[in-house]
Amino acid sequence: MTAPAQVPDSDEGFIRFEGIHKSFGPKVVFDDLNLSIRKGETLTVIGGSGAGKSVLLKCLIGLMDPDRGRIFFDGQETTGFDEKQFLPVRRRVAMVFQGSALFDSLSVGENIQYPLREQEPDMSEEERAKKVARVLSLVNLPGIEGMRPSDLSGGMRRRVGLARAIASDPEVILWDEPTTGLDPISTRIIDELIRSMRAKLHVTSIVVTHDMQSAFTVSDRIAMLANKHIVQVGTVAEMRASPLKEVRAFLDARKGEARVE
């Protein structure tokens, strides 16, 4: 059966992927992938396991290179940048990892300060402490600077990971499966935080998730990755009403995954 045509996305976005091809040996992950992300929006990328959602994030920040195609960040092409050239881009981007990626040997406060010491070496200890307190308040975890990650629940660890990410004042936040493995209450808290980051900090967010309830809650637009490219980009209402078989099959398969609270 013929695959649906690649979705054109000519909108001059803040972040753009144009004609991206990526393979790992014989496995083709992207074949002429195009996607545009608008400044200040929350765009969620959905798709089956192994579709390449996380690979897309890694290509954006230079952890992987596309085989062909072009990537633009705020009007500047970053394709082919070396590590030194990517540094200014990475300082504008923060990633919230599925596993939080906290150092168990450090306190919560020390974990949040860790990237600040490298990125802002001239910042005083008092300024760092104030920033840590501010970002912990933003994720509704005030006063836990002295706790260890091992003392925290999974949801709290995820929120500390977010606090560390926003401590560097990013313009873009990348969320890699932010609700995976969390209980329904923690999931709802993370969803609310994703929404509040846009409202309070005016960041651009790219969310990778299998959790369609979360995607419907947090997204301005949703992009469906299937058949090695983006088959549809649309609002929540447009995706719910999509006639495309790839989108319908993906959504129908997840109808039974409703959260129990």
Name the predicted role of every residue range.
Residues 61:
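Helix-to-loop junction immediately C-terminal to a conserved catalytic motif
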Residues 76-77, 120, 124-144, 195:
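Conserved ABC ATPase "signature" region
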Residues 78-94, 118, 125, 239-242:
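ABC ATPase NBD coupling module
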Residues 148-152, 156:
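Conserved ABC ATPase signature
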Residues 167-171:
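A short, proline-enriched helix->beta-strand linker immediately N-terminal to the Walker B motif
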Residues 173-176:
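Catalytic Walker B motif of ABC-type/P-loop ATPase nucleotide-binding domains
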